[in-house]
Each structure stands twice: as structure tokens, then as C-alpha cells.
């Protein structure tokens, strides 16, 4: 039986979250070279605790996909909801978000063409969540 593990945002997305104000208490961090590292058993840290002393140890906190999605929902009224879609070859997940202020659904790519869906479809739900989080941070916040 496979072990279920937490899915963390990528190093690039974690840096974007820090830049955009994500400051929750987290026990996982990214080192300056991009490796994921767990803090001591009961320790946690916030991005705002980053200073001259800690910069030698870590670059930014490493939230799970769910924490990042919840932060976007609570702080920015953006609900991430990838859709399962059928493509020419198989099934996959389409990045998608809902603007809760307008109650309007959006696909993150303006030029999206359903006839060429394979170009935008992610193989896994987690990759679709990551792609949508990154898009929202880069274009909406």
C-alpha cells in the first residue's frame, strides 16, 4: 500500500507566496538552494520571522497546497477548483479558479482553446492546484 504524503507548493510558488504576504506558522521550510526541510519536532516559523540570522538557514516557509489554497480563499476570495476533463488521449485536470467576489469561474489562460485542451491539462489534481495557485499569485494578487 502506498504511503500518503503531504503535497507542498514548489519552491518558486513558496517564494511568490512570501512576496504576496503569506505569513502562516509552518513547520516546513525551503532552504536557499530549494530543498525542502522540516524544522525540529515542535518548531514552526513564519515568513515574517525571516531575518539576518535565519537567512543562512532557510529562504521561505513551505506551505502545503491546501494551506495555500485556503489562504487564497480567505485572504483574497479566490477559490481553486480544478476540473476533471477528457482530452483527445485521456483524462486530466484543468486549472480553474472562482472569484468569490463576482461568483464567476475562470480558466487561468485567456487564450484557452478547448479544441487544444491537451496543452493546458495537468496530469494530476495536485499539479493543477499548483499551476492555478502560481497563476493567481502572478496575475491576480
Locations of the language-model features?
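Glycine-rich anion-binding surface patch
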Residues: 1-141
Amino acid at each position: 500500500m502506498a504511503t500518503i504524503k503531504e503535497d507542498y507548493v514548489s519552491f518558486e510558488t513558496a517564494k511568490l507566496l512570501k512576496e504576496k504576504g503569506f505569513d502562516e506558522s509552518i513547520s516546513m521550510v525551503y532552504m536557499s538552494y530549494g530543498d525542502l526541510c522540516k524544522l525540529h519536532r515542535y518548531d514552526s516559523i513564519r515568513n515574517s520571522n525571516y531575518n539576518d540570522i535565519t537567512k543562512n538557514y532557510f529562504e521561505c516557509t513551505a506551505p502545503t497546497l491546501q494551506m495555500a489554497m485556503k489562504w487564497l480563499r480567505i485572504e483574497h476570495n479566490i477559490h481553486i477548483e480544478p476540473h476533471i476533463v477528457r482530452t483527445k488521449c485521456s483524462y486530466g485536470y484543468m486549472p480553474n479558479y472562482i472569484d468569490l467576489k463576482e461568483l464567476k469561474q475562470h480558466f487561468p489562460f485567456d487564450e484557452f482553446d478547448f479544441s487544444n485542451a491537451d496543452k493546458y491539462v495537468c496530469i494530476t489534481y495536485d499539479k493543477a492546484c499548483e499551476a492555478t495557485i502560481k497563476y493567481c499569485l502572478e496575475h491576480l494578487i
